[in-house]
Amino acid sequence: YWADLAERYAFEAPMSDITFMGQPQRRILRREPVGVVGAITPWNFPLYLNLAKLGPALAAGCTIVLKPAPDTPWSATVVGRLIAEKTEIPAGVVNIVASSDHALGEMLAADPRVDGVTFTGSTATGRRVMEVASRTVKKVFLELGGKSANVILDDADAGAFGAGILTCTHGGQGCAIT
């Protein structure tokens, strides 16, 4: 999906002109890779979330250092091995660093060689990632906390939401929409 999107997306496409504060503005969409992306993923949905971090970074032309959760390192390790053995992605573009040391995520966020950080997980940890990354003024992309519970109002049509509610796993706390 991401490779196809990168090939067919209209980068460098002019957008419609707008007026802002009384002045005409010319806009253009430009593809500019962030650079080195540090990606920190949680334990739930590990394969999907690792791919959800890798795909956009690679499609944008970035290199990536992926740090999976300490509880689920093998999903990322297998993906890294498949990339190394089955793709033409050059060595060093995708880097997997698995560790049980939670300080590794903080090291990624703080490292001045990392240009952007993406994190999926708890709000408390996301705040810490943002705090540490701000010291080197890098881009930070956060998807935080389980906040997508099903809310069904009294006047809702039961037939309209029946099948959808069955797919709501983890009580809305699964970070699968990253």
Report residues per predicted region.
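N-terminal Rossmann NAD(P)-binding subdomain characteristic of aldehyde/semialdehyde dehydrogenases
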Residues: 1-54, 89-90, 94, 100
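ALDH superfamily catalytic-core signature
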Residues: 85, 110, 116, 123-178
